[in-house]
Amino acid sequence: MRRIKIFDTTLRDGEQSPGASMSVEEKVEMALMLEDLGVDLIEAGFPVSSPVQFEAVKRVAEAVQRPIVVGLARCVEKDIDAAYEALKDRPKDKRMIHVFIATSPIHRKYKLRMEKEEILERVRKYVTYARQFFDLVEFSAEDASRTEVPFLIEVYRTAIESGATTINVPDTVGYALPDEFGELIRTLKEGVPGIENVDLSVHCHNDLGLAVANSIAAVQNGATQVEVTLNGIGERAGNCALEEFVMALKVRKDRLPYETGIRTELIYPASRLLTHITGLIPARNKPIVGENVFLHESGIHQDGVLKHRETYEIMKPSDIGRSSETLVLGRHSGKHALRKKLESYGIKLDDETFQKVFEKFTELADRKKEVYDDDLFSIVSEVLKEPLNGYRLVHFHVHTGNTLLPTAAVVLQVGNEKKEAAETGNGPVDAIFKAIDKALGLQPKLEEYIIQAVGTGKNAQGEVKLTLKIDGELYSGRGVSTDIVEASAIAYINAINKYLIAKGLLRKNGGVE
């Protein structure tokens, strides 16, 4: 099985996505995650462009051990010098320079104002210059997919003769179709002298939504390296998404006999870290990492998944490091899904009682987009005429400031029982979580925390979704409020209540067993 190198450019091309800029420290944190994920190369930045970019490349090169660290440079002497200065302390076999120049007619005429001969001379001069400092040199012909093929062959021949160890074929504006891009790669593979001695890389943009398809077509026609970003972030519509490309190979290995070094179980944690750093939340229906990917609301789909997951799922959530909660209850849900959801919390009802619960559930589902677990607990409590909601937040107080140690106090109540506690923390949200832990005598581990706005303007609310690990199992919670700390506390208590209910730890008259 042929191995495909994964060249990750999240920290360089991905960061060029509007709103995705990262500090030096954030780039280092992300680079360490990418190393754990198993990427082969990390393009850390464009050293000549600013002191911050230079420092980021240098710091990433110092932080990671296994991957090759790459610095970008134009075919300009000062760019190459800056890349060398940023990477010179890294072992020669673990550092690479990526030099590029545009080659398409529109770029030659309007951007560079150069003739073909001038382009070839620059390639020859600056790839040769780069090889004085780097054993590993990648050369890219920017806008390759819109460049005349005979000229493109000549450009890559010149780059290889001048010492390039990787040639990269960018579909810079996402213009190519899979069949023509695959044909281009095959033509280059057959027509460029010496290409068999170097890596053949592709860098596809997603302007027509074809970045992953084009990358797969390239691999099928001889490419040995694919350039990607996490969550597909990047210029304009983004780049080939690491998670989509890798999982396509994994899921369809019957037709795609290629492997990568990616630890797929770390894909979702890596995606969440990037979201946390940049604030860019993937669309709910984003393949692989979107919130809806493993969720089913249709009753027919839910029934099928409950009987056998592969009826409607081509991969397991655990394959990418996600929890296995898959049922979203709404107006399309049926009895099977509702009963399964209740049983997951230890709530077993006889047929007559369940029918009453189901009728109230369908009434509520017709009025709401989604029925949450708290809604279910309220319905069951109403039908059974006994409390099932667990703890609620009666009162909280947070004391914080830029010169103060954040402190939170909470009052929680279930039935007739109240519990109070106060704690300090690393910020107001952390403080209130610790106060809740202290009040309930629990030590959950926060696995995931997502916050997003609901609505706009001064009346916008914050929605917090989080996941806790308690006794080795995962429990999700949701909270909404105009106050982010309150929304966080509600979500935290919501997740804990699910644990208490599932384990049968809530007494009917209130309190914990």
UniProtKB/Swiss-Prot annotation:
It comes from the Bacteria. GO terms for molecular function: 2-isopropylmalate synthase activity; acetyl-CoA C-acetyltransferase activity; manganese ion binding. The keyword Cytoplasm applies. Coiled coil: none annotated. The keyword tRNA-binding does not apply. Keywords: Amino-acid biosynthesis, Branched-chain amino acid biosynthesis, Cytoplasm, Leucine biosynthesis, Manganese, Metal-binding, Transferase. Its EC number is 2.3.3.13. It catalyses: 3-methyl-2-oxobutanoate + acetyl-CoA + H2O = (2S)-2-isopropylmalate + CoA + H(+). It holds the Pfam family HMGL-like. It is found in: Cytoplasm. Pathway: Amino-acid biosynthesis; L-leucine biosynthesis; L-leucine from 3-methyl-2-oxobutanoate: step 1/4. Mn(2+) binds at D13, H203, H205, N239. Its cofactor is Mn(2+). Gene3D superfamilies: 1.10.238.260, 3.30.160.270, Aldolase class I (3.20.20.70). Its main location: cytoplasm. Homodimer. This is 2-isopropylmalate synthase. It comes from Thermotoga neapolitana (strain ATCC 49049 / DSM 4359 / NBRC 107923 / NS-E).
